[in-house]
Amino acid sequence: MPLTVGTKAPDFTLPTKTGEGPKQIKLSDNFGKKNTLLLFFPMAFNDTCTTEMCGVSLDLSAYGSLSATVYGISGDNPFAQEAWAQKEKITVPLLSDYEHKVAKTYDVAYDSFLPQMNLGMGGVPKRAVFIIDRNGIIQYAESNDDARALPNFEKVKAKLAELK
């Protein structure tokens, strides 16, 4: 069960890699400024994840107008994320939860991802969404065990509009 609405969002610091170089992103740096939209997804170079992140990238200005900072989070290393973002023209900042600590803290990590393939991929993030308000409180939480199911972005936008 993922973290619930009304609880304080656990703080974290994760790396990102862009053309400007690597940097660390700390969740609480947004507190007091903007709402934060966290989009957990299983992995780069996957059809459903590409569809999700490309769609959000195309709509990034709409999220900005709703006073939200958006981050995509996967267990990929920052270099793989950067290569994927460049290939697919993804503009959402991607954070690397390479050790799966944040996915586990937010309780959205698979015990075993794609168990039928016997790859031993535990800890991979589920597809999940958290909206965290300016005070660091979770205002929306959605998680899905089916990695092919996209979040309900209409509900996400409606909630962000309420918080604006």
Write out the residue ranges for each language-model feature.
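Chalcogenol-based redox active-site neighborhoods
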Residues: 1-164
